[in-house]
Regions:
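Helix C-cap/helix->beta junction micro-motif
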Residues: 69-72, 180, 240-241, 401, ...
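N-terminal small-domain helix-loop-helix segment of the aminotransferase-like
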Residues: 43-144, 151, 331-335, 443-445
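PLP-dependent enzyme catalytic core of the Aspartate aminotransferase-like
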Residues: 36, 128, 386-388, 395-405, ...
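Active-site phosphate-binding strand-loop segment of PLP-dependent enzymes
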Residues: 185, 190-262
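Conserved PLP-anchoring active-site segment centered on the Schiff-base-forming lysine
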Residues: 155-177
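Conserved glycine-rich beta-strand-loop-beta hairpin in the small C-terminal domain of fold type I
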Residues: 329, 345-355, 367-381, 415
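Conserved core segment of the aminotransferase class I/II
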Residues: 96, 267-346, 353-357, 441
Length: 445
């Protein structure tokens, strides 16, 4: 068979009954080639314009470069994702056993909002924390918090609506708002004040298009844990401007040095709608199980039309994965093994403190002490390090020292002078990793 410039010749006098299978295939190929020659090459297939401004740099181009280096045979220490399992953290045995035990009952769809026992366990958890009006129907189970965030924003946003998002943020929020047609407006968190939200900056950025306020507490990437006064101040802004509050609390159980987590929902009263997101991934070390939840509190009657949206979208996705739902009741009602990790002597605690100390020992590097979560977010003094492109900086670090971190602008920070480091490796590995970072920075001064 020839290309477009040639001819394909088959004996036209041949009887169809005598055409061999091979010739039949050749005739089909000839027809396909002729069609291609007539129509030209296939048009490019491009991604939707909706993705034009969507980024998720935690798993973005830098991770692609890390995979390329691994394919060349290099060993990369990945400090870019808060995933406990690869660093030797195992799920509580009771959770795994309960999932295995219930597998025969988990083969079909569940209720679209989640199985009743899981939603009841979540509702009772919040009731025990002072949110006594929480009902089972106020709970949606999801395939992790990420799914629920995207689902709720799709139900809430019209094109051009604005949502206030902290800077730095967990970039899923910015990406999901953009993908849902909204506009993320980033308010500054104050590094000199322990990364607390700048309430005046929030007020200054509210417009007639502003519809909601995102709170991430404990904070990813900074490790800040907000005081009760700060939480009340954020809720009061939402109250004055009739904003819906989206409270991301996935790290609520990972707290250091007697830090206290204050549920945003305990302060909203009857006039602020609050959507709280949490789950099992971090505190129970089961990121891969994808078990998260949404809790709705505040004035539900005025929000009835909006709340039909998440219900519709939950129906369209059929249901959350059923096996992992069986872990929720066991996790929330059982022994809280997370407490072994967050106090002195525990791995989360010791690794966070060690990383913070070692980073601050590097000339030109400063890091606010994390009070929770699994990260450090150090600053590189611009007077010492002339970094114009922090993404290129972390790529250069990766290539030189085989350490993978995430650049600060990947968390929508305003200046190219920070990076995020995961504090999950054991102390020896973490010490070596930060030593390599220090060696690399010595070449940049």
């Amino acid at each position: 068979m020839a290309g477009c410039g040639g001819a394909i010749s088959l004996d036209g006098a041949m009887s169809p009954r005598k055409v061999s299978p091979r010739l039949s295939v050749e005739r089909l190929l000839a027809n396909a080639t002729a069609l291609l020659c007539e129509t030209g090459p296939m048009r490019p297939i491009v991604q939707s314009r909706k993705l034009q401004h969507v980024r998720y740099d935690v798993r973005g181009p830098i991770l692609v470069e890390a995979h390329r280096l691994e394919a060349e045979g290099h060993k990369i220490l990945k400090l870019n994702i808060g995933n406990p399992a690869p660093f030797g953290f195992e799920a509580p045995e009771a959770i795994v056993a309960d999932i295995v035990h219930n597998l025969p009952e988990a083969q079909g769809y569940s209720d679209s909002q989640g199985i009743y026992s899981a939603r009841t366990a979540v509702a009772q958890y919040y009731q025990s924390h002072g949110l006594t009006d929480t009902a089972v129907d106020d709970i949606f189970i999801g395939n992790g918090v990420s799914e629920l965030i995207s689902m709720v924003l799709q139900a809430f946003l019209d094109d051009g609506n604005e949502i206030l998002v902290p800077a730095p943020d967990y970039p899923l929020w910015t990406g999901a708002i953009t993908l849902s047609g909204g506009t993320p407006v980033h308010y500054r968190c104050d590094e000199e004040n322990g990364w607390d939200p700048d309430l005046a900056d929030i007020e200054a950025k509210i417009t007639e298009k502003t519809k909601g306020l995102v709170i991430i507490n404990p904070n990813n990437p900074t490790g800040a844990v907000y005081s009760e006064g700060t939480v009340k101040g954020l809720v009061e802004i939402a109250r004055r401007h009739e904003l819906v509050v989206f409270s991301d609390e996935i790290y609520e159980k990972i707290l250091f040095d007697n830090a206290v987590h204050h549920h945003t929902a305990t302060h909203v009263g009857a006039d602020v709608l609050c959507l709280t997101f949490s789950g099992l991934s971090k505190a129970y070390r089961v990121c891969g199980y994808r078990a998260g939840w949404l809790m709705i509190s505040g004035p539900k009657h005025p929000a009835a039309n909006f709340l039909e949206g998440p219900t519709l979208l939950a129906n369209m996705r059929m249901c959350p994965n059923v096996p992992a739902q069986h872990a929720i009741q066991t996790a929330l009602g059982g022994y809280q093994s997370i407490n072994e990790y967050i106090h002195p002597g525990g791995r989360f605690y010791e690794q966070s403190k060690t990383a913070w100390r070692l980073l601050n020992e590097i000339p030109g590097v400063s890091c606010v002490e994390p009070r929770g979560a699994l990260y450090c977010f150090p600053r590189l003094d611009p007077e010492v390090y002339d970094i114009k492109d922090d993404e290129q900086f972390v790529i250069d670090l990766l290539r030189a020292k085989k350490i993978l971190v995430t650049h600060g602008t990947g968390f929508n920070w305003f200046e190219p002078d920070h990076f995020r480091l995961v504090t999950l490796p054991d102390l020896d590995t973490l010490t070596e990793a930060i030593g390599r970072i220090g060696d690399f920075l010595a070449t940049q001064r």
